[in-house]
Each structure stands twice: as C-alpha cells, then as structure tokens.
Design a protein with these regions (language model features):
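A short, small/polar-residue-rich loop/turn motif at beta-strand boundaries
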Residues: 11-16, 28-45, 78-94, 112-157, ...
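Structural preference for long, well-ordered alpha-helical segments in enzyme cores
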Residues: 20, 53-57, 81-99, 137-148, ...
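Acyl/amide activation-and-transfer machinery of modular secondary-metabolite enzymes
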Residues: 54-77, 106-132, 157-162, 172-173, ...
C-alpha cells in the first residue's frame, strides 16, 4: 500500500535536472532542452510493489554495487536536428510507463514504484570544439559513454532515460541513449526503438496500444493465478535442491592479486564446433553450448549431476514478448552427464532446460526464504554456478553455414589467449557467461567470472578451455564421451 501523498505526487508533473559529469570538461558548451511528456497511467496502482522481474534486477544491482546502465550510441546524418530527438524522447516517455516511473524507498516497507503522468526530462546537447579532430571527438565520446555507464540513476528523483546529443561545428554527430537497467532489459530497449521506427509517419503515434506495463504485471502476479505459478515454481526448486548430494565443505584459499577476476576466451573453434553439432542434432547453437557447459562443469567438479542457476527471460510467456521492463529471473538447471556422449548430454539438456524455464517465475522474497530453509536443512551454503547465455536472451541462435570437420580442426590448431580482468567485487562464487556481440559472427566469447578464493584461476581457465575442446572433439566425432564416470554407492 502506498501513502496518499505518493499517489498524488505521481499524478503531478515532475521536472528532472540534467546530469552533470566530469567528461563535460571535454566539451566547450552544454545546452539543455526540457522535453515535456504526457502519458496514460499514474500513481502506484493497487499495490505499488515491484513485480518479480523488478525484484530480481534491483537485487542484482544492489548485490553487484554497479549501476548496470545500458548505453547505445547512434551515428547521425548531417541533416539531423535537435527537434527530432526531442520528439523521440517524448515518444518513449508518453508511450512507456517504465520510462516515467520512479521508486520510493522506506526503511519499514519494500520499494514502491510510482508512475508519473506528466513531467519534463532534459535532452542535453554537448558541443565539441569546432577545430576538434576525429581522434579528439572519438575520445570525448568514449569518455562520455564510460561515465554514463557508471553514473547511477537516482531512482527516486531521476527518470530512467537520458539522451545526450553531440554537436561538432554546428552539426549533430551522435546520440547517446542511456537506460537505467531497473526500468528495462535489452530486449525491452529494442522493443521501444522498434515501436518508434514503426510509428505512424503522419501522426507520429504508435500503431497500437502497449500490450502490458510493469505495473500491470505487478497486479497480475498478485492474483490467485499468479500465486499458483509462484508456488509451483518454488515447489520445483525445493524438490530439486533437496535431492542434490551434499558437498564436502571447503574453506576459502586466498590467491595472490585481486580476489575477484574474469577470464575471457574469444573462441573461433567453439563456435564452429557448436555450429557443426547443432546441424547434426537439428538444434540451436545455444542448446549445444548449454550441454558443453554442463559437461565441462561436471568435469571440473567431479560430480556427475550438475546444478546451476540460469538467467531466464520470461518473454516467452503470453503477452510478455515485447514488454518494456524486466522479466528475467533465475531458473534452476539440473541434469546428469555421467557415462554418455556429449551429443546425448546436449539432447538431455534441451529437455531439462524446459523445466528450468517453466519454473523461473516466482516471488523473489519467498524464493529467498526457501533457499535459507533448504540451506539450514542441508547444513551447507548452496553456492551454485550461474550460467547466462546472452545471445539466447536476444532471440534464436539458429546455426549458420555448417563447417566441415577439417575446418573445425584447423581453427582448433590456433590457440586463443585468455584475457584476464580484475573485478572490484563479484557477488557469485562462479558464473559462466556466453557473450557474443551481434557484430561478431566468427567466434563465441566465454566469460568466466569468479571469486578466486573459492574457484582458482587455473580452474576458471580450465572451464573455458574444456568447453572449447569438447566442442571440437564432438564436432569431429559424434561418439565423443563426456569423460564423467557414474558414482557407485558403497554397499551397506
């Protein structure tokens, strides 16, 4: 329940001040245009609480201590004018409640989301020196993007979208759009832009109504049907976690250097091998990578049954495909990889991940309580590996042209280096991320992030290298085994 004062505040117009960053010193002038908006919906709805996806992303932002801002740079034609981008910003604000939502925090209650019907948002125009060369202009833009990536939004007072125009010698050259990740994920950002591109050319209005807003989703999840879905998901988690074998407790072992690290492997043979396997098994590349990950993790841990959390986009659910908001949550992936082929693991993984997706939709606070209860009963902390396949979150990962076994083997002969990055903090023991940029279709990048006091650097590298070597071996020989033996229980 939200206080009446907050509801009234949501109905009134609100002005947000422009953001001031250190990189502004690289520019010779700064101008601000206040863009007004007027959209449907206001206040906090019947409950004002956060929906499950919002709970998840806010928790991730807090745990990481990172803004997780999303930045996009658009190069502009010489004919671009400021008024066009004021209208674009107004379109997003008028149409999408997520872009005009602020949060209210209280020590006594969970966060509340408040939608504003009217208000203004600043559109900034930054001027480069007229005599700035291309190198200076590029450096200034790079610095601006880097600062906006790290400059957190004020969730209580700043609407979750910033637009900054770069001007050089009187000509607009670039648009930087910054989104607060709490407001939407990448798929939602693309949906916003698609709606803008497909608007009516005469009226400038969208061609249809918004299917659903985040506040609508909050109301849906509070219904009896929503509660049943959450309860079913939590029962699945409880059953699967209770069945996992207990592990021998291990103490943290400090390593020299930074405790939190990321190993990055950009692998051509991994993509080629996975593509060849995908053609053989008639599946997506993402399914192959999941099976390779499961096998590599089992080899590393020595456990025949692996359990991992997966980031699941719930956009496959009815009415949620194009929502501008966050609908991703953790799913639980469990499967056995012992005494079988890599091909078989990949096919099993496709069946297992269906359950993962089905039960990745639940009330986060109840989920936290369940995990705490399970850990008490088991007498150990459940530090599961996290797996995130970013390309599969953007859409399908159908394989490209089928490479020959010779092509895969030739690529494997060239060893790519592991690139190490020190992290200031990381909130998981171990996380594997498939991170293939849309403009890189020649390789797949595996990011292994970890607390190196629990997962040594050699194990981080081994995990990425094993995924690659398994892909090459299985691409060339369908009979390739996982190399994981079944554990035989002692009699008596």
């Amino acid at each position: 329940m939200v206080a009446a004062g907050d509801q009234e505040h949501g109905r009134r117009g609100m002005t947000v001040a422009p953001v001031s960053l250190a990189s502004a010193s690289l520019f010779v002038a700064c101008q601000t245009v206040d863009v007004s908006f007027s959209g449907d919906g206001a206040g906090a709805g019947s409950s004002g609480g956060l929906n499950w996806g919002q709970q998840h992303i806010l928790g991730a932002i807090r745990n990481l201590g990172s803004s997780m801002n999303m930045c996009a740079v658009r190069e502009l034609p010489p004919t671009a004018i400021v008024a066009d981008f004021a209208e674009e910003l107004r379109f997003y604000l008028n149409r999408f409640q997520a872009m005009r939502t602020l949060l209210r925090f209280s020590a006594d209650h969970p966060p509340i989301q408040v939608v504003h019907a009217t208000g203004t948002v600043p559109l900034q125009i930054l001027d480069l020196a007229a005599d700035a060369d291309d190198a200076a202009a590029s450096a200034a833009l790079t610095a601006l993007v880097a600062e906006h990536e790290q400059h957190s939004f004020d969730d209580e007072h700043e609407f979750p979208i910033r637009m900054v125009l770069i001007r050089r010698a009187g000509i607009l050259t670039h648009l930087l759009t910054v989104l607060n990740h709490f407001a939407t994920d990448g798929a939602g950002a693309f949906a916003m832009y698609e709606d803008f591109l497909n608007r009516d050319p005469v009226t400038g209005l969208a061609r249809g109504p918004v299917p659903i807003h985040p506040l609508d989703l909050t109301a849906q999840q509070a219904t009896a049907a929503g509660r049943r879905q959450s309860d079913a998901s939590l029962r699945y988690w409880e059953k699967q976690l209770a069945a996992l074998p207990t592990r021998r407790p291990t103490a943290a072992v400090p390593e020299p250097g930074s405790r939190y690290r990321r190993a990055s492997l950009r692998s051509v043979p991994l993509l080629l091998g996975a593509t060849r396997i995908a053609h053989r098994l008639d599946c997506d590349v993402s399914a192959v990578l999941l099976g390779l990950f499961a096998t590599a993790l089992a080899r590393l841990t020595g456990e025949q049954q692996i359990a991992a959390q997966m980031l699941v986009s719930n956009r496959f659910r009815p009415g949620m495909a194009n929502i501008v908001g966050n609908v991703s949550q953790s799913g639980l992936f469990v499967m056995d990889v012992a005494d079988t082929t890599v091909d078989d693991v990949i096919e099993r993984a496709q069946r297992a991940v269906t359950r993962t997706y089905k039960y990745a939709y639940f009330d986060l606070e109840q989920w936290k309580a369940l995990l705490a209860s399970v850990e008490r009963e088991r007498g150990e902390e459940l530090a599961l590996c996290y797996y995130n396949d970013r390309p599969s979150q953007r859409g399908g990962t159908a394989p490209g042209t089928q490479p020959s076994a010779e092509t895969v083997a030739a690529a494997a002969a060239q060893t790519a280096p592991i690139v190490w990055t020190e992290l200031p903090f990381f909130n998981e023991r171990l996380m594997v991320t498939i991170d293939s940029p849309p403009d890189d279709d020649e390789a797949v990048t595996v990011l292994v992030s970890a607390d190196s006091w629990h997962v040594p650097r050699k194990d981080m590298e081994e995990l990425a290298r094993t995924m690659e070597s398994l892909a090459v071996a299985a691409a060339c020989d369908p009979a390739t085994l996982t190399g994981v033996a079944a554990v035989v229980e002692a009699a008596g």
